[in-house]
Amino acid sequence: MAPSAKDLLELFKVKQTALLLVTGVCAYLEGAGKPDPATLVLASLSMFLSIAGTTGFNMVLDADIDSAMFRTRNRPLPARRMSAKDAVLASSAALAAGLAAGVAVNPYVFVAGLLGFLIDIAVYTVLLKRKSPWSVVFGGFAGGMPALGGWAAATGGFGYQGVLLMLLVAVWSSLHIWTLSTYYSEDYRRAGVPMLPAVYGERAGVVASLAAAVAVFLVAFLAFRAGLISAVGFAVAAVPLVLAVAVLLKGLVSGEYREKAYRAFKLVNIFMGLFFVLLVLT
């Protein structure tokens, strides 16, 4: 039986994919000045399919981990609603189409998509995720590739501004994952995945999240100094990030590590979407 559309969307983590696509589209709009509709559509298609295909491969490789975790055991592969073969075929088709669309835009968009796949699958998922509590620091660079690709689609190259946007998403990825894995630390221990909060404890997860939040703020400030976002846009986007820091500090004092980390997780997601939207609007 062919996988359902719902299961395919879940395989590709469509909400997460959409958030990363927003970073790429906004990076394109910021860099283009006068956007070309055809280039925007083709670049968006390239980014969406490349991210989706990469995510699908990640789900195949992590199916055993997902089976062991309460949070993820109902995903299509561990729940056996989709075979690994079907998942690989769907992911391969999406990735190939995404990279082909990238070539049609320009070589830099293709390279960004390919690097995203290689970093996420080879470096993060295969080499580091099951071995190092610092895996997300390296894996986060995969999440930054759509922003870099979007900038490259607009400008014909990477450039320091494109690299800054990529770094912002990369550093934010550590914050995103550490806040979430602090809340679900017991799940990660059960699955044998050495996420930082699972190895060093929830308090360490909050401390690491605070350090990552400071790093995110600094990179965002550099983006402001580089002229990528206005002072008003930067100030407005920083509000949920500052609130997340306040929540994490409160958790550090009160000992409510898991609860405050989860609240901060929601706030930092708002920050990321807001920053990139304001990048364009301001």
UniProtKB/Swiss-Prot annotation:
GO terms for biological process: heme O biosynthetic process. Belongs to the UbiA prenyltransferase family. Protoheme IX farnesyltransferase subfamily. Pfam families: UbiA. Keywords: Cell membrane, Heme biosynthesis, Membrane, Transferase, Transmembrane, Transmembrane helix. Converts heme B (protoheme IX) to heme O by substitution of the vinyl group on carbon 2 of heme B porphyrin ring with a hydroxyethyl farnesyl side group. GO terms for molecular function: protoheme IX farnesyltransferase activity. PANTHER family: PROTOHEME IX FARNESYLTRANSFERASE, MITOCHONDRIAL. InterPro entries: Protohaem_IX_farnesylTrfase (IPR006369), UbiA_prenyltransferase (IPR000537), UbiA_prenylTrfase_CS (IPR030470), UbiA_sf (IPR044878). It comes from Thermofilum pendens (strain DSM 2475 / Hrk 5). It is an enzyme of class 2 (transferase). Its main location: membrane. Gene3D superfamilies: UbiA prenyltransferase. It catalyses: heme b + (2E,6E)-farnesyl diphosphate + H2O = Fe(II)-heme o + diphosphate. One of its GO terms (cellular component) is plasma membrane. Pathway: Porphyrin-containing compound metabolism; heme O biosynthesis; heme O from protoheme: step 1/1. Carbon 2 of the heme B porphyrin ring is defined according to the Fischer nomenclature. The gene is ctaB. It is a multi-pass membrane protein. This is Protoheme IX farnesyltransferase.
